[in-house]
Amino acid sequence: MEQLLHYVWKHKIFPLKELKTTTGQQVEVIDTGLANTNAGPDFFNAKLKLDGVLWVGNIEIHEKSSDWYKHGHDTDPGYHSVILHIASQIDTEIKGSNGERIPQMQLSCPESVYANYKELLETDSYPPCYRIIPSVSSFTLHSWMSALQIERFEQKAALLSERLKRCQGNWEDAFFITLARNFGFGLNGDAFEAWAHRIPLRAVDKHRNDLFQIEAIFFGQAGILEDFDGDDYYLRLKKEYAYLQHKFELVPMDASQWRFLRLRPTNFPHVRIAQLACLYHRAYGLLSRLMETETLQEVRDILKGGTSAYWLTHYTFGGSSPSRPKTLSKSSLDLLIINTVVTFLYAYGLHKGSEVLCARAGSFLEELKAENNYITRMWEQCGMKAGNAADSQALIQLKKEYCDKKKCLYCRIGYEYLKRK
């Protein structure tokens, strides 16, 4: 209920006239203030008139006024600047840390808002607001989508920042781990990330001119060179890895982490590892090259990949198959660009203070085709069709950060739903 009161106050969903404090002072709301999601009062820099006198300060909201004491605000100097305490139930007077009484106002949630909110939380339909989406103005939807796009950029940049810290600020290492994870295309994402942490790029750099040696490191660290028997290529890789393992003190991962169930052969870990080995053999300074690209085609040309000759006729070690190039499909390339390259362009742009790189990240998304997955298909059924990858990223953000977490109070579509009569 307290969150709902925050919502009612923020959006002024209450009678603006005849508002009074518990002691009878007339209240005129000029500005409800800026919502605070961190520690401290709920709204900063609100502007009110109490009996015609202008007050500027903070607002605190509780379900019961006694919660003020329950939460220890009476002894916290951080709440000294509260000019009005709002509660749906007034059960006691309150005082600040300086001992002065703080004005209070009783505020109830309108019945229609409460009923709509309860409906959103309890409905079995998904998303619960689907009925009203067709009636929401295009301006509201477009502005909300734009905000979600930026929010997703910022969220991904924050996650990348944490990864960078774990990589001691090394952008190349962070990029390799991110790229490898996304090469898992969902099912093997965790396994590829664990594998990438075991790949010493400095060792790879020393053998970059020899694709066979890079493959030996990559496959060996994946834990899939442990069998005693195999074809000639497998046995040569195994022997080469034994030498490199001793040279660089390498410790392989447990091969049981890899998943094969329900995977198409082109998505088998062996094929993806072979593609990554070829990519790092061909593209020296991969991250720098990608950050310098100006067109999507340049990015695709760098990432399009390929494999050594052995993998033209194999999906795993052993049994052969008809010869077929193992290059990344356009849809797979685009997913790697969306989830890896664009993210790094934006984050690196922030790091360098480069508006050009940040803008390029946005323009790449707008140029890329919208993702086709269960989330985008669900929104399309509700009347929200993604026109490009920027839109599909926004819709993914909407589902994961608002719908799944029931944060309807913070969603602009939820706002339209709640204000219905």
Which residues make up each language-model segment?
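Cysteine-cluster motifs in flexible loop/terminal segments that predominantly coordinate metals
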Residues: 393-421
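Compact, glycine/acidic-enriched structural inserts
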Residues: 80-82, 86-144
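A broadly used, surface-exposed interaction patch
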Residues: 42, 46-93, 98
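Short loop/turn segments at secondary-structure transitions that flank enzyme active sites
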Residues: 65-67, 90-92, 111-113, 185, ...
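N-terminal "leader" segments that precede or initiate the main folded domain
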Residues: 1-6
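N-terminal ordered "arm"
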Residues: 7-66
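Hydrophobic, aromatic-lined core segments that form the binding pocket/scaffold
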Residues: 148-394, 407
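Short, structured segments at the rim of ligand-binding sites
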Residues: 39, 76, 411
